[in-house]
Amino acid sequence: MAKSGRDKIKLESTAGTGHFYTTTKNKRTTPEKMAIMKFDPKVRKHVEYKETKIK
C-alpha cells in the first residue's frame, strides 16, 4: 500500500478559548506551520488559528 502524504493536524485558537478544528495537510507542499483566520464560536469572532500536533 502507498504511504499517505497527508498528516492530521489540529488548528487551535489563539484567543485562548481552547476551541480547535482538525484537518489534514500535504506535508510535501506545505512544510511550514499553517495559520488561518477562522470563526471561534466561544468569542463569536474570527481569530487566527495556528497549527499544533494532535496528541
From Swiss-Prot:
GO cellular component, one term: cytosolic large ribosomal subunit
Single annotated GO MF: structural constituent of ribosome
Pfam family of the protein (one): Ribosomal_L33
Protein name: Large ribosomal subunit protein bL33
Polar residues compositional bias, start-end: 14-24
UniProt xrefs under SUPFAM superfamilies: Zn-binding ribosomal proteins
Lineage of the organism: Bacteria, Pseudomonadati, Pseudomonadota, Betaproteobacteria, Burkholderiales
Segments of skewed composition (Basic and acidic residues): 1-11
Region annotation Disordered: where it falls in the sequence: 1-28
Biological processes annotated in GO: translation
Entry keywords, A to Z: Ribonucleoprotein, Ribosomal protein
Family: Belongs to the bacterial ribosomal protein bL33 family.
Record gene name: rpmG
